[in-house]
A protein has these predicted regions:
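Class I S-adenosyl-L-methionine
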Residues: 1-109, 114, 219
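Short secondary-structure boundary/capping segments
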Residues: 22, 42, 67, 123-125, ...
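Class I SAM-dependent methyltransferase SAM-binding "motif I" and its flanking Rossmann-like core
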Residues: 2, 13, 82-85, 89-155, ...
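Active-site catalytic pocket residues across diverse enzymes, especially alpha/beta-hydrolases
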Residues: 46, 119, 123, 175, ...
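A contiguous loop/helix-start segment that scaffolds small-molecule binding in enzyme catalytic cores
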Residues: 2-4, 60, 71-75, 131, ...
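A generic local structural motif
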Residues: 15-21, 37-38, 62-63, 120-121, ...
């Protein structure tokens, strides 16, 4: 029996697929990709049976994997971004374990990280925010009570919100339970794609920003005071490179 590989395809730009991910994709006999999210440019030139999972059920996906590995074929299951965020690989892995199918997970570049690179900044700024919260607004998939957006907002940490641009009015209301209305926000649609959009503003204006730009989905919402670093000097320095800071490599 062969093996299945869950591969993070990165945010969209084909050059942001990892070297290992590219190698496994190119050598796969069967590729199952998230067609509504993965950039089709990534699939160009591959010599494999290709299945678009956009309209498939969990059982249909695992059925293809089972049939393929039993035939000795290498399977690449291609997900957008990094597999650790909202990829639904957990339920697929449970099925593979039940079927005694060997698998391996290959990480990818998350759109959240790509977005920070687009902004040209880090998300943790000394004395301003040393915590980043990755989350989503409750939708069809419920979230635990302690992870409601309104409760997370009270930390005032840097926040990256997935899968929520289509419910922007509710997002604003929840965020205002913790952040001030003047808190910087950035919305990035289709990060690193040719169609990429970047919109900046303040929390009080976030609804109009999203609606006026025509952003509806496949967008990330960044919130927090750390976002000022992409447009102004904050004068906050870490101790790491301070001349008086001593460590094992600099005494």
């Amino acid at each position: 029996m062969s093996k299945a590989y869950f591969i993070g395809a990165g945010p969209g730009d084909p050059e942001l697929l990892t070297v290992k991910g590219r190698r496994l994709l190119d050598s796969a006999d069967v590729v199952i990709y998230a067609g509504s999210l993965v950039n089709p440019e990534i699939l160009k030139g591959i010599n494999a049976e290709v299945y678009n999972s956009a309209s498939m059920t969990l059982d249909e996906i695992t059925g293809i994997i089972l049939k393929s590995v039993e035939s000795g074929k290498k399977v690449a299951r291609l997900h957008t971004g990094d597999t650790s965020f909202y990829s639904a690989i957990s339920e697929q892995i449970e099925k593979l374990r039940e079927l005694n199918i060997e698998y391996e997970v290959i990480p990818g570049v998350s759109s959240a990280m790509a977005g920070a690179a687009i902004l040209g900044q880090e998300l943790t700024i000394p004395e301003i925010s040393q915590t980043v919260i990755f989350t989503r607004l409750e939708g069809k998939t419920p979230v635990p009570e302690t992870e409601k957006l309104s409760k997370l907002a009270k930390h005032k940490a840097t926040m990256v919100i997935f899968l929520s641009a289509g419910m922007i009015e509710k997002v604003k209301g929840e965020l205002l339970q913790g952040y001030s209305e003047n808190t910087p926000v950035v919305i990035i649609e289709k990060a690193t794609w040719k169609e990429q959009k970047v919109v900046r503003g303040q929390l009080k204006d976030i609804v109009n920003l999203v609606k006026d730009s025509g952003i509806k989905k496949t967008a990330l919402i960044y919130v927090g005071e750390s976002l000022r670093a992409s447009s102004e000097s904050l004068g906050k320095e870490s101790k790491l490179y301070h001349k008086d800071f001593k460590h094992g490599y600099r005494k």
